[in-house]
A protein has these predicted regions:
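Extended, polar/acidic
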Residues: 1-129
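A generic structural motif
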Residues: 46-55, 138-148
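Short, solvent-exposed amphipathic alpha-helical segments in soluble enzyme
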Residues: 38-40, 130-136, 193-194
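Glycine-rich and small/hydrophobic secondary-structure elements
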Residues: 2-31, 152-201
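Proline/glycine-anchored alpha-helix kink/cap motifs
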Residues: 104-108, 128-140, 163-177, 200
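Beta-strand segments within the central parallel beta-sheet cores of soluble alpha/beta enzyme folds
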Residues: 116, 139-147, 172-182
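Short acidic loop-to-helix transition motifs that present clustered carboxylates
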Residues: 99, 123-124, 148-149, 181-185
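Helix-loop-helix module between adjacent transmembrane segments
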Residues: 112-114, 148-155
Length: 205
């Protein structure tokens, strides 16, 4: 729900898989040929491959490279028990690997809105984000849950939602979109990696 994903990358592409263009066609092969005709001139940046580098590097996001830094104290942080354990722990990026592929279909409506049928965990949040991205009133964006197909947190973020609706509104025709596994792995939001520092104190009991 933090608006840090542009609908299409502009000025800067931040990762392999970030959308830079969308194409609609009446056959997948025609769409592939159209995609192959798109040329993008990239200036390669030095990659940021860990969080510490990203904190110190020049920002690649409008609000900086750190989305959230949390300090959590539970109990008295200055208390010292008979046993104290502290350390830094790291959790790597994970893909939720749900069984159902990412897919959806959007229908333009006669009232100027759009009807989106898609797998999601957050119908109302998705509607709000799509409406905001398309500059439409929320009541003109109608999102219907088309089954979940597994999620595990992986369907909390919008992926193809806005693209589907943009294409349907632009063409005036229903538009279906399906990501294959490679496209999901490259482009969809994964469970984020994290670095966590803990100090635990306890008494003998």
């Amino acid at each position: 729900e933090h608006p840090d994903q542009p609908v299409l990358a502009f000025d800067m592409v931040r990762y392999v898989g970030e959308p830079v263009a969308i194409v609609a066609a009446n056959h997948p092969e025609v769409a592939k040929k159209a995609i192959d005709a798109i040329y993008v001139d990239y200036e390669q940046l030095d990659p940021l491959v860990n969080s510490r580098e990203a904190i110190e590097a020049a920002p690649i996001h409008p609000d900086g490279n750190v989305i959230r830094h949390l300090v959590i104290n539970h109990g008295d942080p200055d208390a010292v028990g008979n046993i104290t354990v502290e350390g830094e722990y790291e959790v790597g990026m994970q893909d939720q690997a749900f069984l159902g592929t990412e897919s959806g279909i959007a229908f333009p409506s006669t009232d100027g809105g759009v009807d989106l049928h898609i797998s999601t965990q957050w119908l109302h949040s998705d509607r709000d984000q799509v409406a905001s991205a398309l500059n439409l009133p929320e009541d003109l964006v109608r999102v219907t849950l088309a089954g979940v197909g597994g999620a595990f947190g992986g369907r909390e973020d919008v992926s193809m939602h806005v693209h589907l609706c943009m294409l349907a509104l632009h063409t005036g025709r229903p538009v279906k979109m399906v990501y294959d596994r490679n496209e999901s792995f490259l482009g969809h939001v994964h469970r984020h990696p994290a670095k966590i520092w803990f100090r635990h104190s306890a008494d003998d009991s």
